[in-house]
UniProtKB/Swiss-Prot annotation:
HAMAP family: TolB. Belongs to the TolB family. Part of the Tol-Pal system, which plays a role in outer membrane invagination during cell division and is important for maintaining outer membrane integrity. This is Tol-Pal system protein TolB. It comes from the Bacteria. Residues 410-431 are annotated as: Disordered. It is found in: Periplasm. Residues 1-18 form the signal peptide. Keywords: Cell cycle, Cell division, Periplasm, Signal. Its main location: periplasm. It holds the Pfam family PD40. It comes from Myxococcus xanthus (strain DK1622). GO terms for cellular component: periplasmic space.
């Protein structure tokens, strides 16, 4: 993956840009920026009641971003009543705890609206480098947290964060497996299905629809549903259809269809019409399609060579080539929105499942997880910087997130339960 230089641009005037430190997001020179984030200040009683949900989401966003080292508040020595203005801040106290940047947030409730102001300071110079205000419904403090965190991330990286995106996943309860949609961190989750076996959800490009495989007719069919809408069968009719994936333009879906002793990758219009097979191996299994970000290629899993491996083909089924040659059981590929990597699950020499990336161009494989239970079912964030996945490292299968190079692995803020097959939505059009 090409290294992105994270310009911290802590000096806004042009004359000072040459002095701005940079952080290389990937590679040996990467160093997260040490940042102090004291508890939010509140301007009225209404805001005080909303500090906890805001702070939980905001702290998680910054910690999981991978670009910041959020310092432990227990070590802070500055006055907790310190204000938002630079003149009221004792920067030497923040420097003493190792902070290079200071993030201050103030909250105020105005009727049904929660308003927030964020200020970013360079601890070394005492200069204010960012001042931004956002608001959100008062009953959704985490949305305000995501909006402010996104503004901070954009300031540092000059690209959108994943904080305003959504994830979908399956939550298992007894014999039921239901599809859920939630904020990227697992908050504000709500069920899309109710009862039965519903698996392998995938979000459309605009996030307005979820395709999933369901057994409601006692066979696997592919349905599409919008949050709050009715589920509609798009691939149904007796054969076993699984694992739909929307094309980047949202006009097509790729999926696997079992026919006798084989399973082939198909592509169809998003409404299920115009279906045609892209693979044709009489006794082989071809499954788990995932689109390249430009929609011109599809990666998939096939055992045509004797064991499940990741392959790539053109979106019309031509130009098939094998991508992975290490390991004897590779599955669940997901193509990075940046186009350079595919992340997948592999069974290693100890029969443990772990996550790896493979370069689309060179075939170089990089290990991301090891010695922490089974780690499976990865999906890239919409900016390609993070990966969501399932892990059994703490018992049951839970949702985790990490940076695309395998660092900074954290559990999502989900309730207790058993989770499967997460998928990440593209970024919303309006940030």
């Amino acid at each position: 993956m090409k290294a992105l230089l994270l310009s911290l641009l802590l000096l806004l005037p042009v004359v000072a840009l040459a002095q701005a430190p940079t952080i290389e997001i990937s590679g040996a020179n990467f160093r997260p920026l040490p940042v102090a984030v004291p508890a939010p200040l509140t301007q009225n009683d209404g805001a005080k009641a909303l500090v906890a949900p805001f702070d939980s989401a905001f702290s998680f966003d910054l910690t999981a971003s991978g670009i910041l080292q959020v310092l432990d508040r227990k070590g802070f020595t500055a006055d907790a009543k310190e204000g938002m203005a630079a003149a009221s801040i004792n920067f030497s106290r923040w420097a003493d705890v190792g902070a290079e940047a200071l993030v201050k947030v103030s909250l105020a409730q105005d009727g049904g609206v929660l308003r927030g102001e964020l200020r970013l300071f360079n601890v070394g110079t005492g200069r204010e480098d960012l001042k931004v205000s956002k608001d959100a419904p008062a009953d959704n403090a985490s949305l305000l947290a995501h909006r402010l965190a996104d503004a901070l991330y954009r300031h540092f990286t000059r690209e959108p964060s994943p904080f305003l995106s959504r994830i979908t996943y399956v939550r298992k309860a007894g014999t039921n497996r239901d599809v859920y949609v939630a904020d990227w961190d697992g908050g504000n989750a709500r069920a899309l299905t109710k009862g039965g076996i519903n698996i392998l959800p995938a979000l459309s490009q605009d996030g307005s629809q979820v395709a999933f495989t369901t057994y409601r007719k006692n066979r696997p069919d592919i349905y599409v549903q919008s949050p709050g809408g009715e589920a509609k069968a798009v691939i149904s009719g007796g054969q076993m259809a699984t694992g739909a994936a929307f094309s980047p333009d949202g006009k097509r879906i790729a999926y696997s269809l079992a026919e006798g002793e084989s399973a082939q990758v198909y592509v169809a219009n998003a409404d299920g019409s115009g279906a045609r097979a892209l693979t044709d191996t009489p006794y082989g299994l071809n499954t788990s399609p995932t689109w390249s970000p430009d929609g011109k290629r599809i990666a998939f899993v096939s055992n045509r060579g004797g064991s499940p491996q990741v392959y790539i083909m053109n979106a019309d089924g031509t130009g098939v080539r094998r991508l992975t040659f290490q390991g004897n059981y590779n599955q669940t590929p997901d193509w990075s929105p940046r186009g350079d990597l595919i992340v997948f699950t592999a069974r290693d020499e100890r029969n443990a499942f772990d996550l790896f990336t493979v370069s689309v161009e060179t075939g170089k494989v990089t290990r991301l997880t090891q010695d922490q239970g089974s780690n499976e079912e990865p999906a890239f964030s919409p900016n390609g910087r993070l990966i969501v996945f399932t892990s059994t490292r703490n018992g049951g299968s839970q949702l985790y997130v990490m940076t695309a190079d395998g660092n900074n692995q954290l559990p999502l803020r989900t309730e207790k339960g058993t989770y499967q097959t997460p998928d990440w939505s593209p970024l919303p059009q309006a940030q």
